[in-house]
């Protein structure tokens, strides 16, 4: 489960997906199981991250700067903190959120947000301490990441004692192939903000490069999976590997044009394990392995914005392919931004329409 490491590390986690060199035709069959949906929160304004906390609340961010907790049993929303420094510009603002894996003894909260720095739009990752119902003692872990009204990445995942951060190209295509730039990367830090000694380059926070706008990140089966927005083609699901190049902007999706094939060979490019053309705008990503909805066991769940659909990607027993893909909620709630999964197996999705956004609970009928 995304950003719920105290539960995630206990699960038998697996993932891999079907590789179709021509891309998906987006004509997947309808959902293979009947799902009931109910709204547990409404009147939100662009929620961006939702995650299940150890207090049985859904912790969530809203792009304008709010961090809150939702009790899904009652619908009660409790404000945690509004960060005045946050500047919401286009798709920028208050974005990713993660909780320390040992939250009961180390109540730390990690957030990503965009702000103005001497007239420049920038992004930072800050660690807070949760105490007395609010967040205190901010510590900046990494700063001066270029931000933009689009392509900010900003998903967080804590794996063991390391913090992974996805960054977009911030509309500057020169950055992803430059390993000394922080944009267009998956970054990896220690939880105190220092650079791990076993990163690909000493003193450099990058873990992988050549990314356009990865907005989904989940750890499963000792692998880190990402969902990444393509341009007008080739949204991607990737497996993130240490020090590897994922091709952007020289490669879009698979290495299947003459120019791409040469670049891929010369630069040892990692191809996506799934790609969609036309695009569906892949965003939040999570892993499902609960008995509540047995048809979804061993699946990746992907929230999509443009397609306004929740995708279930069923993984094979060998974890090297997708056996089938199912679609849920198509157009029912509009754009879907993120997903979280409760220990009970219930699934929650948040919308990204603005003004009257909702968090929706999914359960088996």
Feature annotation, model-predicted:
Residues 206-236:
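Repeat-solenoid scaffold signature
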Residues 1-8:
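Bacterial N-terminal signal peptides that target proteins for export
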Residues 9-36:
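Bacterial Sec-dependent N-terminal signal peptides
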Residues 28-173, 219, 223-230, 278-318, ...:
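Acidic, Gly/Ser/Thr-rich repeat motifs that build Ca2+-stabilized beta-propeller blades
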Residues 123-132, 179-191, 239-241:
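Beta-propeller blade signature
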Residues 78-92, 138-152, 191-208, 248-277, ...:
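Surface-exposed loop and turn segments in beta-propeller and other repeat-based domains
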Residues 231-246, 305:
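Short edge-strand/loop segments of extracellular domains
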Residues 320-343:
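Conserved blade-ending motifs and adjacent loop-strand segments that build the rim/top face
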């Amino acid at each position: 489960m995304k950003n719920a490491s105290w539960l995630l590390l206990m699960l038998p986690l697996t993932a891999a997906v079907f590789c179709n060199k021509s891309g998906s035709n987006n004509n997947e069959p309808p959902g293979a199981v009947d799902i009931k949906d109910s709204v547990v929160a409404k009147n939100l304004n662009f929620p961006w991250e939702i995650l299940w906390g150890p207090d049985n609340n859904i912790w969530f961010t809203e792009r304008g700067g709010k961090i809150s907790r939702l009790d899904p049993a009652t619908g009660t929303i409790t404000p945690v903190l509004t960060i005045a420094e946050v500047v919401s510009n286009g798709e920028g603002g208050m974005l990713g959120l993660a909780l320390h894996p040992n939250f009961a003894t180390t109540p730390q909260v990690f957030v990503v947000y965009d702000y103005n720095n001497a007239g420049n739009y920038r992004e930072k990752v800050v660690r807070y301490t949760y105490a007395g119902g609010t967040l205190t003692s901010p510590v900046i872990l990494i700063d001066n990441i270029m931000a933009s009204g689009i392509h900010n990445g900003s998903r967080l995942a804590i794996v063991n004692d390391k913090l992974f951060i996805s960054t977009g190209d911030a509309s500057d295509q020169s950055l992803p192939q430059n390993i000394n730039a922080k944009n267009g990367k998956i970054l990896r830090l220690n939880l105190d903000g220092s650079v791990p000694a076993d990163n690909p380059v000493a003193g450099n926070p990058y873990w992988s490069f050549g990314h356009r706008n990865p907005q989904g990140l989940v750890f499963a089966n000792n692998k880190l999976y990402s969902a990444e927005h393509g341009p007008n083609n080739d949204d991607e699901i990737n497996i993130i590997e240490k020090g590897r190049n994922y091709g952007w902007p020289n490669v879009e999706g698979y290495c299947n044009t003459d120019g791409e094939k040469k670049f891929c060979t010369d630069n040892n490019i990692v191809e996506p394990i799934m790609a969609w053309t036309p695009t569906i705008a892949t965003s939040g990503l999570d892993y499902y392995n609960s008995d509540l909805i047995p048809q979804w066991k061993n699946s990746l769940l992907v929230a999509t914005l443009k397609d306004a659909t929740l995708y279930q990607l069923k993984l094979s027993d060998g974890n090297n392919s997708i056996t089938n893909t199912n679609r849920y909620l198509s157009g029912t709630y509009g754009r879907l931004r993120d997903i979280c999964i409760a220990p009970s197996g219930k699934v929650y999705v948040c919308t990204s329409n603005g003004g009257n956004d909702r968090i929706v609970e999914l359960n088996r009928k």
